[in-house]
């Protein structure tokens, strides 16, 4: 399979920028319409950024800034 099959998304997060759980607009860019976290191969994030993003999304869900599941999806 060709490597150009998947279109790599450019990350809106620069290396070194913090990922904050209160920045809901940023977190929504990395979540599907069903509420799932996008995989690293689609987001273009580094491994550390993906871990930080996952923790931020989970924390935002716990404090009710993001829904666990999108009922409209």
From Swiss-Prot:
State the family it belongs to. Belongs to the bacterial ribosomal protein bS18 family.
Cysteine disulfide links:
none
Its quaternary organisation is: Part of the 30S ribosomal subunit.
Q: What SUPFAM superfamilies does the record point to?
A: Ribosomal protein S18 (SSF46911)
Gene3D superfamilies in alphabetical order: Ribosomal protein S18
Q: Which GO terms describe its cellular component?
A: cytosolic small ribosomal subunit; organellar chromatophore; plastid
- Signal peptide segment: none
Task: Give yes or no: UniProt keyword Membrane.
Answer: no
Which GO terms label this protein's molecular function in UniProt?
A: small ribosomal subunit rRNA binding; structural constituent of ribosome
Source organism (scientific name): Paulinella chromatophora
One family name in Pfam for this protein: Ribosomal_S18
Q: Which GO terms describe its biological process?
A: translation
For this entry, the protein name equals: Small ribosomal subunit protein bS18c
Give the superkingdom in one word: Eukaryota
| HAMAP family linked | Ribosomal_bS18
Which InterPro entries does the entry link to?
Ribosomal_bS18, Ribosomal_bS18_CS, Ribosomal_bS18_sf
């Amino acid at each position: 399979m060709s490597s150009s099959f998947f279109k790599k998304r450019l990350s809106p997060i620069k290396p070194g920028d913090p990922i904050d759980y209160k920045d809901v607009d940023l977190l929504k860019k990395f979540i599907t319409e069903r509420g799932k976290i996008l995989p690293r191969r689609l987001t273009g994030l580094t491994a550390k950024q993906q871990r930080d993003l996952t923790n931020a999304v989970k924390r935002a869900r716990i404090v009710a800034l993001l829904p666990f599941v999108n009922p409209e999806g």
